[in-house]
Amino acid sequence: MLRKLLFFLTFFITGVTLSAQKNVKSVFVSGEEGHKSYRIPAIIALPNGHLLAFAEGRVNHAGDFGDVNIVLKISKDKGATWSKLQTVVDYDKLQAGNPAPVVDLTDPEYPKGRIFLFYNTGNNHEGEVRKGNGYREVWYKTSVDGGNTWSDEVNITTQVHRPYQPQINPAYNFKEDWRSYANTPGHAMQFESGKYKGRIFVAANHSEGNPKPQFTDYFAHGFYTDDHGKTFHLSQTVNIPGSNESTAAPLADDR
């Protein structure tokens, strides 16, 4: 009996695995569609069931810095097939990355929903940015037609970042001296109920001041909007040195 049970379980698990493998779709394939590598994916679903898959499209290599675009593919059949690749953000030969998309479903001006795509740009390698030899900025774009077209970019760096780079921009004059900066990885989120209903929240991380051993100059934080992107605010910094690659999910008690 035990042998029969083990055989059944093995057959069942193998069958499920093979069945799942048949449904696997490669959305982004390194070396195809103009990019050597794709990293940092994020996927969201629209109210109509369409899926939007974002990623960093790294043009020349798999490294974090360089000619990096934010690209998108859309599926209208629950992931069975995908559209051709669309470039949503192209920061010339520099880096645009860390896509954090979310659908705002609570704005009365957009009853069908409005997509926000938050992202970062950078002009140097992370190690150099940590030394103060470069800077990171925070932006967003929106779409009201399911990701087919996108708005102009909006720079929200002064609201959600604390850089000390007045030689770049007089407004980047914060004593906190945040340097490296990255959203997520993964999508942003919107609270669906409770006292924060409608709030859009983006998890992020940053480094503070000069580099420290074991990357203890890094800390997690978040930023949010309660008015559909008109203004943004910083959350408290998580006081855990070395915290990085932040993500967030709502809890049952509305936090």
What are these regions (language model features)?
Residues 21-255:
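Asp-box/BNR beta-propeller blade signature and adjacent active/binding-site loops
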Residues 1-22:
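Bacterial Sec-dependent N-terminal signal peptides
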